[in-house]
Amino acid sequence: MNPRLKTLVTCVSLGITSLAGSGAMAQEKIKIGVSIPSADHGWTGGVDFFAQEAKKRLEAAYKNLEVVVVTATGASDQANTLEDLVAAQKIKALVILPYESAPLTDPVRQVKSKGVFITVVDRALTDSNIQDLYVAGDNPGMGKIAAKYFVDKLGGKGDIVVLRGLPTVIDNQRYDAFIEGIKGSQIKLLDQKYANWNRDDGFKVMQDFLTRFPHIDAVWAQDDDIAIGVLDALRQAHREKEMWVVGGGGMKQAVKRVLDKDAATPVDIIYSPSMIGLAIEVTAVHFVSGLPVNGRYIVDSPLITPENASQYYFPTSPY
């Protein structure tokens, strides 16, 4: 976690404990809208959980604060919910994790034009000038860390396939950093396809790769849900001993495999859905304390290995 974010987290904690009931919000009702994708896979399920937890904490601490959490099944559905949040709910701030980057950029711009404070989480908009605050994991770092691991473990040469997420800014950041990281090596990228951060699509895409490529040394799945689908495809094809898989996110099932030294999933990379809770809390503190929280706040994405996996394994976690 970078120093600026550490300071911000401290401010959030102090804001919740010391400003609650202080009268800082006595003059007006503050309504924060939170727009997130529906829980269509494990990571977004974690996002919904941490958003609801932040809502409970903040509404208990600040009696004049209301947090409205809405989910969307797609980009167009999310755009429609934004209209309702502004027109019917009359929000003063929007915390949004866009379903996709490009289709949500103009709808969020329209919300901004109404004087609403904009916090963007994770999947960036295509126009960063719209946002007041951006909170995300280190997406270029994920790609860079994964690339270094692949180069080191493969000894600088081998055949790999890549399963991407959705066509979003953060997916491009991860992928571009990964490709840059393997440049100069003899690692050959056989193919790359979108798997929509979904285990079922990960299964289908990997089935296609297995059919077309008789030899694969390793798989970068980029996401733990996708990785689960990939592993299922490998087992069904009886090729699970031929290659290893690296996902990302820090899902407890993936971390447990790393902890157990599963050869098929030797490492993982953290990208926690709890960042949504941080984004909501920081946005709230902006209103109740007047603290300047504009800017970009990037959460580190460390490599999980068998040596440090116990630090990241939480059996009771929803993700």
Task: Identify the role of each PLM range.
Residues 1-10:
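Bacterial N-terminal signal peptides that target proteins for export
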